[in-house]
Each structure stands twice: as structure tokens, then as C-alpha cells.
UniProtKB/Swiss-Prot annotation:
Reactions catalysed: 2-C-methyl-D-erythritol 4-phosphate + NADP(+) = 1-deoxy-D-xylulose 5-phosphate + NADPH + H(+)
Entry protein name: 1-deoxy-D-xylulose 5-phosphate reductoisomerase
Biological function: Catalyzes the NADPH-dependent rearrangement and reduction of 1-deoxy-D-xylulose-5-phosphate (DXP) to 2-C-methyl-D-erythritol 4-phosphate (MEP).
Record EC number: 1.1.1.267
Gene responsible for this protein: dxr
Keyword Phosphoprotein: no
GO MF annotations, alphabetized: 1-deoxy-D-xylulose-5-phosphate reductoisomerase activity; manganese ion binding; NADPH binding
UniProt KW keywords: Isoprene biosynthesis, Manganese, Metal-binding, NADP, Oxidoreductase
Positions contributing to Mn(2+) binding: 150, 152, 224
Binding site for 1-deoxy-D-xylulose 5-phosphate: 125, 151-152, 179, 202, 215, 220-221, 224
InterPro entries (UniProt xref): DXP_reductoisomerase, DXP_reductoisomerase_C, DXP_reductoisomerase_N, DXPR_C, DXPR_C_sf, NAD(P)-bd_dom_sf
Involved pathway(s): Isoprenoid biosynthesis; isopentenyl diphosphate biosynthesis via DXP pathway; isopentenyl diphosphate from 1-deoxy-D-xylulose 5-phosphate: step 1/6
Family membership: Belongs to the DXR family.
């Protein structure tokens, strides 16, 4: 039996992972589950899957979870805090770690899994955005296996040469597709009135609120560009973003002989999750098969960087290198949180990120301390930007 730990079990990726595991109880056993504060949902998962360990964010949440599990007769060991997250990610009793904690909070436990030589199913893009070189070095030095779970990077992985899924070997370009989000055709002059609920109403995918906003601004695609650079070794000028509203073609790889290989499928995260869990085999993911006669036309267009300035900022950060991507990510997390909380407007997000990038001192991202220091400075600068905008409203 293959033993799995899921970091971020109560989020959309975590729940989809458990759905795939549920379909293949003869192959997989859940060793550990983690969540930050959705204690009751985590308790329900523990009752069903009986993991050996569970980790939550705070002592209060741990006490609540222990009570719920004791009442249910479940003997899962409960712990809390960052150190417990890192411990469970590196646990010798687990084989694969699904890294699905959203944002910078997922960096340390994901890095711990890599350093423990685990099979890392990477759904947390921030680990590579913030500390790409550190993370990839850890994977190589400790013999970890890294499998991308983001639908786009999973698609690229499938389209690259199987024996060496890296840029080179006749690869001309990496083509990342993007739906364009809910505001692809909306008049840019009206975007300042967008509500959080409107921004979270993605036309094709079911996602959490933060990543839904990132999709609406296309910052999500910008972070994926940086992630693709580190995963596949592709330089910025060889990574291209195409808007594809149908979300059927998940990404493509163009080769020097004129060939373009694409991975297609219905928009359902269980497909890349199942691919990562079973690699190099294939298993049923529970996804409705794609019927191209029903899907209709497939359309592609270049992104409008006036409508989507966050995408351009991400390319700028990738080209700048060093701690710039960490600052980009930190500023975006603060700005999106402020937007979801009603403190700033949708159109303020890009401005806050740009201001922070311009103010962040440049430096190498060669140590985790340097990355986390840049992250902290960028968050403080972003909070100041949010406060200044809020004072004007």
C-alpha cells in the first residue's frame, strides 16, 4: 500500500485528492492530513480515512479536533503548529506528500518533504515561486521525486520527453494556457467595481477564493510562469501564455521541428492528481471523458497586459530574479486578502504589487533566510500600501 500525506486536506485540492484515494482504497492509505482552521471538516476526513496523524494550525484547533475524534472513537495523533507540519511532511512512514497548502505558508513543509526525499506532488506553486533554486537543489540533493499537480504544469510534464522532462532536447517553447478568468471580455473601465464574489466566480474551475482572485487578475498565470521556469528550466523568453477560454487544452509544448504537443481533458483537478499519484501508471480519476464533438471549437488569443497587468509584473519579477518573485508573491497575497476583506478595490491589487516590487531591495535568493526576509519586508510594504488606499476611500 502506498502511504500518502496531504498538506491542506480541507482545501479544493485536498478534497479532490481524497476523492481519488477513495476510488482506489486497494492502492493507497492516508497516513496524515493537515488543515489550518477547518477543524470539523478535517475531523470528518479523519473519521473516514483514519490517518495516523493530523496537524492543525493552533493549540485551540488541536484541542477541538482531539475532542471530536475522541467522541468518534478515532485514535489519530493530533498536533499543531509549523514544526508539526514540517515533521509530518518528512515523516518516515509516508511515501508521497501532496503539497496543497495555499500561499507562502506551504513553503517550509513542502521543502521539508523534498529534503526528506519524498515523492512530492506539488500543488503549492509558491514553494517554487519564492525559493525555486533552493527547492530544486533540495529535490536533486536528497533524491526526491517532484511531480507537478497544477493542471498546466502537469500537462507540460506529459508533453515533454518522458526520459528528461526539461527544456532542451528540441523544445522551442513552453505554452501555458489560461482561461482568462471571469473578466476576459469585460470593459476594463468597469473593473474597479468588481466585488469579491464576482472575482471568485470562475467560469470553468472550482477553486478556493484566493486562487480564484489570482485567476481573475491572471496573477495565477504569472506565478505559473515562474513555476514553469524552475520546473522545466525554460527561460522567460521561451515561456508563452495563451488565453484559451474553453480550458480544454491545459498546456502545450512546441518543438523545433514544428510539432506542437498538447494535453487535453475536461477541467477537473482529479486528472492531474490521479496522474501524480499513480505515475508512471494511469488510474481512473472519476473524471467525465472529454468528447471533442461536444466541446466544440477551441480558441486561443494573446493576453492583454493592459487588462491583466499582474501577468506582466510576474514576467518582470522572473527576469529580475533573486528575491523579486518572493516579493511579488508576498505583495499579491496581502493585496488579495485586502480585496477579499473589502479594504481595497480589485484594480488596486496590481498597483500594490507594482509599488512593492519597485521598493523591494534586490538580492540573491540563495538561502531560505534571505527569501523569508524579503517576504516579510514585502508584506509590510504591501500592508502600508493597503492602509494608504483604505485611508483615501
Amino acid at each position: 500500500m502506498h502511504r500518502i500525506t496531504i498538506l491542506g486536506a480541507t482545501g479544493s485540492i485536498g478534497e479532490s485528492t481524497l476523492d481519488v484515494v477513495r476510488r482506489h482504497a486497494d492502492r493507497y492509505v492516508v497516513h496524515a492530513l493537515t488543515a489550518h482552521r477547518q477543524v470539523r471538516k478535517l475531523a470528518d476526513q479523519c473519521v473516514e480515512f483514519r490517518p495516523a496523524r493530523a496537524v492543525v494550525g493552533t493549540a485551540e484547533a488541536a484541542l477541538e479536533l482531539e475532542t471530536l475524534l475522541r467522541d468518534a472513537g478515532v485514535k489519530t495523533e493530533v498536533s499543531h503548529g509549523e514544526a508539526a507540519l514540517e515533521s509530518v511532511a518528512a515523516d518516515a512512514q509516508t511515501d508521497s506528500v501532496m503539497a496543497a497548502i495555499v500561499g507562502a505558508a506551504g513553503l517550509r513543509p513542502t521543502l521539508a518533504a523534498a529534503r526528506a526525499g519524498k515523492r512530492v506532488l506539488l500543488a503549492n506553486k509558491e514553494a517554487l515561486v519564492m525559493s525555486g533554486r533552493i527547492f530544486m537543489d533540495a529535490v536533486r540533493e536528497h533524491g526526491a521525486t517532484l511531480l507537478p499537480i497544477d493542471s498546466e504544469h502537469n500537462a507540460i510534464f506529459q508533453c515533454l520527453p518522458a526520459d528528461d522532462p526539461r527544456y532542451g532536447r528540441g523544445v522551442a517553447r513552453v505554452l501555458l494556457t489560461a482561461s482568462g478568468g471571469p473578466f476576459r471580455t469585460r470593459d476594463p473601465a468597469t473593473l474597479h467595481d468588481i466585488s469579491p464574489d464576482q472575482a471568485c466566480a470562475h467560469p470553468n474551475w472550482v477553486m478556493g477564493r484566493k486562487i480564484s482572485v489570482d485567476s481573475a487578475t491572471m496573477m495565477n498565470k504569472g506565478l505559473e510562469v515562474i513555476e514553469a521556469h524552475w520546473l522545466f528550466g525554460a527561460p522567460a523568453e521561451r515561456i508563452e501564455v495563451l488565453i484559451h477560454p474553453q480550458s480544454i487544452v491545459h498546456s502545450m509544448v512546441a518543438y523545433t521541428d514544428g510539432s506542437v504537443l498538447a494535453q487535453l481533458g475536461n477541467p477537473d483537478m482529479r486528472t492531474p492528481i490521479a496522474y501524480g499519484l499513480a505515475y508512471p501508471e494511469r488510474i481512473d480519476a472519476g473524471v467525465t471523458p472529454l468528447d471533442l464533438t461536444v466541446a466544440g471549437g477551441l480558441h486561443f488569443e494573446k493576453p492583454d497586459l493592459v487588462r491583466f497587468p499582474c501577468l506582466g509584473l510576474a514576467f518582470d519579477a522572473l527576469r529580475a530574479g533573486g528575491v523579486a518573485p518572493a516579493a511579488l508573491n508576498a505583495a499579491n497575497e496581502v493585496a488579495v486578502e485586502a480585496f477579499l476583506g473589502g479594504t481595497v478595490r480589485f484594480t488596486d491589487i496590481a498597483g500594490i504589487v507594482r509599488q512593492v516590487l519597485e521598493a523591494t531591495p534586490q538580492g540573491p535568493a540563495d538561502t531560505l533566510e534571505a527569501v523569508l526576509s524579503a517576504d516579510a519586508l514585502a508584506r509590510e510594504a504591501a500592508r502600508e500600501g493597503v492602509a494608504a488606499l483604505a485611508a483615501k476611500r
